[in-house]
Amino acid sequence: MRIEKCYFCSGPVYPGHGVMFVRNDCKQFRFCRSKCHKNFKLKRNPRKTRWTKAFRKLNGKEMTVDKTLEFEKKRNRPVKYDRELINNTIIAMARVQKIKERREKTFYKNRMEGVKGMQKKQKLKEINQNLSLIRGPSALNKLQERIKNNAEKIEQLTTTKMQS
């Protein structure tokens, strides 16, 4: 049983699922769902369509260069059945999957390192610019008065300390 890759989104196409388009030059295109097939017929570029794996890899959102990705390559050479080889392969697949998940986590952490601080800055800036939208006008006036009173109290305290 061979699991093919969708030509458009690079998702898995299981046997008996999806659509296959064969061009006049015998080039085969497999699609996992009608969404991919329609986008292909509309001549859309998978690298410019935001939800495809091609876009994600091109824009640095997924790992592109890693040794664990080479285990997924398509191999056309048939191998004689050997029970021990199959068992070793299954064990290796599990080990490779764990390594791949660990590397993907670190890749994601490195990618998201400065994002939280940047988002917080943007939110605070937006709040300061649109303060009148958050609070009603009467509450805003009271808040401004309270800020002025606090500023006056601070000035009085500093002047009394200087005089003594």
From Swiss-Prot:
Q: Which GO terms describe its cellular component?
A: cytoplasm; nucleolus
Keyword field: Cytoplasm, Nucleus, Ribosome biogenesis
Family designation: Belongs to the eukaryotic ribosomal protein eL24 family.
Q: PANTHER family recorded for this chain?
A: 60S RIBOSOMAL PROTEIN L24, RIBOSOME BIOGENESIS PROTEIN RLP24-RELATED
The answer on whether this UniProt entry bears the keyword Cytoplasm reads yes
One of its Pfam families is: Ribosomal_L24e
Can you cite a GO biological process for this protein? ribosomal large subunit biogenesis
Name the job this protein performs: Involved in the biogenesis of the 60S ribosomal subunit. Ensures the docking of nog1 to pre-60S particles. Activates and recruits ATPase AFG2 to cytoplasmic pre-60S ribosomal particles.
Keyword Cytoplasm appears in the UniProt entry: yes
Mind telling me which CDD domains this protein's record contains?
Ribosomal_L24e_L24 (cd00472)
One GO MF term attached to the UniProt entry? structural constituent of ribosome
Q: What is this protein called?
A: Probable ribosome biogenesis protein RLP24
Coarse class of the primary localization is cytoplasm
Task: Spell out the subcellular localization from the entry.
Answer: Cytoplasm; Nucleus
Query: What is the top-level taxon of the source organism?
Result: Eukaryota
How does the record describe its quaternary structure? Associated with nucleolar and cytoplasmic pre-60S particles. At the end of biogenesis it dissociates from cytoplasmic pre-60S particles and is likely to be exchanged for its ribosomal homolog, RPL24.
